[in-house]
């Protein structure tokens, strides 16, 4: 059973525990700048929203990489950067429509969420349950896709 990160924005307090846990898990240091998850602050509303790679089914980053450094981890469903293969060309950062792949100056490589090998530190660290790691079927995405197919909800130009 595939699992996904599920974010409930209304529960986020902006404590940054997710960013700290991520940076510690991946770099052994508490540095939000090194985190693969970010908390966006909507200053005009006071809302905080965590965001990270959505592990797209049709991952543009994976297809765009000229050296095939981004591959699918079949166990977790995550699209993972192989740092030994990555040449730091940043094509994947341009291809990602969500801006969740970042270039790391220190290494000359890119980084993105890899779901921590199936045990995301951000979800474990979130004190409010704003970030959870749940069965993909629970999100209802499959049912929404089935309804869209049945209804033929294709965009049309008027």
How should these model regions be labeled?
Residues 2, 31-67, 72, 83-158:
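Flanking helices and flexible, charged tails adjoining ferredoxin-like Fe-S electron-transfer domains
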Residues 4-9:
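Local sequence-structure signature of Cys/Sec-based thiol-disulfide redox active-site neighborhoods
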Residues 10-30, 35-42:
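A positional/architectural concept
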